[in-house]
Amino acid sequence: EKQSKKIAKHIIISVPVWDYYKPKKELALKAYQVLKEVKADSGLIIFHPFRYHKDSDMWYYAPHFHVIGFGWVENVVETYQKYGYIIKNLGKRETLFGTIYYQLSHCGIKKHNHSLVYFGDCSYSKLIVEEEEQESKKCPHCKEYLQELECNTNYNLKPDPNIMEPWYMAKS
């Protein structure tokens, strides 16, 4: 099923305190597992190591993930009871660009780590890039298709550079 038929949702996955000591890679693997359980099977994920405390105007360590996910978010209570990860479905956003832009504006950045990672059907391994057909070049005067010529440098002739630049000639 194409992802374009599903509605993108903003989901937050908060890591339980007992997993705070784990490296980001382990936390991300668990987050993907949690996403599968709640049926958010593809999208993008952004890691945030800190949260902002308004009253103290300070950032504190509280790792969590922001997800723009496709699929139905269900089994949240059961998944929480199983893993301890809190899943918040913030639903459809007014603008995906604005949501992603804001989340990237204060995400965790670390050398050799991507700030934004695609997963599921949105992952790079599932991306199919179709080659574009090149537009055929036609002669501006006779409208015939042009054919490529090989340049023979054995002659000392100096042709007009305007003619030789593209090295094309109409088929006869």
Where are these predicted regions, by residue range?
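Right-hand nucleic-acid polymerase module
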Residues: 1-61, 70-172
